[in-house]
């Protein structure tokens, strides 16, 4: 799956993820429904109008698997960030609905700072949100990946040299971006979790009993 700015709904998660096209050959298909399953064999043949060798198709397939691996890594990273953002939104709503005291004010301040950090990390991947009109953001991971993705999928032969260079660049960008995500999670978010342990949010206020004489 491609990285997503927000947590996917249950309905979205139920959709089957797509992948690269298979190379020509014989394959076994397994269909399952509940406890029942059945198998069948199919043979995939390539478009005879396209002059490309099996060797080049295999090289292309191997290359595209490396491309998809970067998608998987970034999807895993953004999914973690989305879960943190979901938690922040829930906690902010909870704090806003309670009586404000000094401890809650500090928690709210920390939550807003964490949310700002999440937004900054999101921009590294997706860029600025809700931009009207045509606006390129070449510094983002998504822009660089799309350049590689569309160029690679439109080439049906052996990967070109410029595609190899772009893959190397997106690997480095994926590594550096996920490293920043990891630092935020291990330092900022875990630090906030420890702060909550030491300064728990009181979900209810003590209510005195009615004096009855």
Language-model regions, residue ranges each:
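Short acidic/polar micro-motifs centered on Gly/Asp/Asn
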Residues: 1, 34-35
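Glycine-centered tight-turn motifs at strand-turn-strand junctions
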Residues: 1-18
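Extended hydrophobic-aromatic, low-complexity segments
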Residues: 3-7, 38-41, 51-54, 134
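A glycine-anchored, Pro-Gly-centered beta-turn/N-cap motif
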Residues: 18-26, 36
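Mature extracytoplasmic or organellar-lumen-exposed domains after removal of signal/transit peptides
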Residues: 26, 33, 40-42, 76-213
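Low-complexity, Pro/Ser/Thr- and charge-rich linker/hinge segments at domain boundaries
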Residues: 41-73
């Amino acid at each position: 799956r491609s990285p997503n700015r927000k947590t996917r709904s249950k309905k979205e998660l139920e959709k089957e993820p797509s992948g690269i096209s298979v190379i020509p050959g014989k394959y076994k298909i397994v269909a399952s429904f509940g406890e029942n399953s059945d198998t069948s064999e199919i043979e995939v043949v390539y478009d005879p109008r396209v002059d490309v060798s099996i060797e080049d198709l295999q090289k292309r397939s191997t290359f595209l698997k490396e491309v998809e691996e970067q998608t998987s890594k970034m999807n895993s990273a953004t999914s973690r960030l989305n879960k943190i953002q979901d938690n922040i939104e829930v906690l902010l709503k909870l704090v806003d609905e309670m009586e404000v005291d000094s401890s809650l004010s500090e928690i709210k301040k920390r939550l807003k700072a964490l949310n700002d950090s999440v937004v900054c990390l999101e921009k590294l991947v997706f860029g600025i949100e809700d931009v009207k009109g045509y606006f390129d953001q070449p510094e983002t991971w998504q822009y660089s990946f799309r350049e590689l993705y569309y160029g690679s999928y439109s080439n049906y032969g052996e990967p070109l040299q410029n595609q190899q260079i772009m893959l190397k660049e997106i690997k480095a960008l994926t590594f550096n971006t996920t490293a920043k995500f990891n630092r935020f999670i291990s330092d900022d978010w875990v630090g906030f979790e420890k702060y909550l342990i030491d300064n728990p949010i009181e979900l209810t206020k003590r209510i005195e009993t009615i004096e009855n004489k």
